[in-house]
Amino acid sequence: MSTKTNEILDILKSITLLEAAELVSQIEETFGVDASAPVGGGFMAAPGGAGTAAAEIVEEKTTFDVIIEDVASDKRVPVLKVVRNLTSLDLKEAKEAITSLPKVIQQGVSKDDAEASKKQLEDAGAKVKIS
């Protein structure tokens, strides 16, 4: 391997899990890729000319999770208020949710609801991901 490759590998070995997740998100945004997408020819057609019958059907995702990844310490109160409005969490549960990140705030919601929640949380100062 080249020196540059070795340096990058050493840096990757030293980062935290949260930093690795942020790195993956940035790579996905920068290069327009999806890290969860399979790479290569993992799909094999059935033998005997049944290729059309075994065609891969791609279903569009209909439910999404809203995940708070980070909240700046000076933005915790506004984010806490939004979390309480979006969920049925009481004050103590909402506070625990925004201090133990990343945390799924909404699960199995529609794309429109997820986008609306993301906007509210980001406007309050949170870093949010939809998956």
From Swiss-Prot:
GO terms for biological process: translation. InterPro entries: Ribosomal_bL12, Ribosomal_bL12_C, Ribosomal_bL12_C/ClpS-like, Ribosomal_bL12_oligo, Ribosomal_bL12_oligo_N_sf. The keyword Ribosomal protein applies. Gene3D superfamilies: 3.30.1390.10, Single helix bin. The keyword Plastid applies. GO terms for cellular component: chloroplast; ribonucleoprotein complex; ribosome. It is found in: Plastid, Chloroplast. Keywords: Chloroplast, Plastid, Ribonucleoprotein, Ribosomal protein. Its main location: plastid. Residues 107-131 are annotated as: Disordered. Residues 110-131 have a biased composition (Basic and acidic residues). One of its GO terms (molecular function) is structural constituent of ribosome. CDD domains: Ribosomal_L7_L12. Belongs to the bacterial ribosomal protein bL12 family. Homodimer. Part of the ribosomal stalk of the 50S ribosomal subunit. Forms a multimeric L10(L12)X complex, where L10 forms an elongated spine to which 2 to 4 L12 dimers bind in a sequential fashion. Binds GTP-bound translation factors. This is Large ribosomal subunit protein bL12c.
